[in-house]
From Swiss-Prot:
Signal peptide from the UniProt entry: none
UniProt keyword annotations, A-Z: S-adenosyl-L-methionine, Transferase
Protein name from the UniProt record: Carboxy-S-adenosyl-L-methionine synthase
S-S pairs: none
Catalysis: reaction(s): prephenate + S-adenosyl-L-methionine = carboxy-S-adenosyl-L-methionine + 3-phenylpyruvate + H2O
Gene name, Swiss-Prot/TrEMBL: cmoA
Role description: Catalyzes the conversion of S-adenosyl-L-methionine (SAM) to carboxy-S-adenosyl-L-methionine (Cx-SAM).
Residues reported to bind S-adenosyl-L-methionine: Y40, G65, C66, S67, D90, N91, D118, I119, N133, R200
Organism name: Shewanella putrefaciens (strain CN-32 / ATCC BAA-453)
Entry's EC annotation: 2.1.3.-
Subunit structure: Homodimer.
Family: Belongs to the class I-like SAM-binding methyltransferase superfamily. Cx-SAM synthase family.
C-alpha cells in the first residue's frame, strides 16, 4: 500500500473544492484513512475474519467502493481454495489503478474482477459477502435504500453485508462529544487545525452520514432480519447484517 504522507490540506486554500477521490487523494489514501478513521485496521482485519466464516465455495464477493483494495486483500487472504470470485468496484480511475498495483503484489488463487464504475450499476448475484466500507455515506441519500435492496436480493441465504460508516447522533450532546473525540484523534495523528478545518469544508457537501437507527431501519425494511453493530469508535461504526 502507498505510504506517502497526506498533506493535501496543509496549506491555506482560498477556495475549498468538494472532496473527490482523485489522483492526489489516491496517492496518500492509505495514510489519510489510517490517521482519520479510528479502528480502520481492525475493521479491515475483521472483514477478512467474516469472509473466512461466511464465504461459501463457488460464490461471489463484492467490495463496493474498494478504494486501494484493503478489504479485498483481507478477504482474499482468508478464502484460498474456495473457487470464489471477488468483484471490486470503485468509480475513481486513480483508485482503481493503484488498487490493481496492490492486488498484483500478492499471489492468490482467488480471481478479482476490478471494475471502474458506479456501484449503483453493478449486478449482484450469487453473493456470500458484500462489503460497503465507508462508501454508502458518499451516495445521495435517496439512492441508499435502492442499493441496499439490490444487495439483499443478490445475497444468498446466510450471506452477509458488512457496512462501515461514519455516523451521526440525534442526541446533540453525544454528537458534540464524539465529534470532538474524533477531532482529538486526528490531532493526535498529526493533523493541524488548518488541515482539519479545510478537509471538513471539502467533505461538507459530499459526505452525508446517517444515524445508526436510520441504518437499521433501512436494512430491516429491505429484508435483513439479523443485524448488529459489531464495532464503534467515536462516530465511526461497522455493522453486520445476515440474510
Amino acid at each position: 500500500m502507498n505510504t506517502s504522507q497526506d498533506t493535501i490540506y496543509a496549506q491555506p486554500n482560498e477556495h475549498i473544492s468538494d472532496f473527490q477521490f482523485d489522483n492526489r487523494v489516491a496517492g496518500v489514501f492509505s495514510d489519510m484513512i489510517r490517521r482519520s478513521v479510528p479502528g480502520y485496521t481492525q475493521i479491515i482485519n475483521t472483514i477478512g475474519d467474516f469472509a473466512d466464516r461466511f464465504v461459501m465455495p463457488n460464490t461471489q464477493i463484492y467490495d463496493l467502493g474498494c478504494s486501494l483494495g484493503a478489504a479485498t486483500l483481507s478477504i482474499r487472504r482468508q478464502i484460498q481454495g474456495r473457487q470464489c470470485r471477488i468483484i471490486a468496484v470503485d468509480n475513481s480511475e486513480s483508485m482503481v489503478a493503484r488498487c490493481q498495483e496492490n492486488l498484483n503484489a500478492y499471489v492468490s488463487d482467488t480471481d478479482v474482477d476490478l471494475v471502474c464504475g458506479d456501484i449503483r450499476d453493478i449486478d449482484i448475484q450469487n453473493a456470500s459477502l458484500v462489503v460497503l466500507n465507508f462508501t454508502l455515506q458518499f451516495l445521495p441519500p435517496e439512492d441508499r435504500e435502492t442499493l441496499i435492496a439490490k444487495i439483499y436480493q443478490g445475497l444468498n441465504p446466510g450471506g452477509i453485508l458488512v457496512l462501515s460508516e461514519k455516523i451521526r447522533f440525534e442526541d446533540a450532546p453525544i454528537q458534540t462529544l464524539l465529534e470532538e473525540q474524533h477531532l482529538d484523534f486526528k490531532r493526535a495523528n498529526g493533523y493541524s487545525e488548518l488541515e482539519i478545518s479545510q478537509k471538513r469544508s471539502a467533505l461538507e457537501n459530499v459526505m452525508k452520514p446517517d444515524t445508526l437507527t436510520t441504518h437499521q431501519q433501512r436494512l430491516t425494511s429491505q429484508g435483513f432480519s439479523h443485524f448488529s453493530l459489531w464495532f464503534q469508535c467515536f462516530n465511526f461504526a461497522s455493522m453486520v447484517a445476515i440474510k
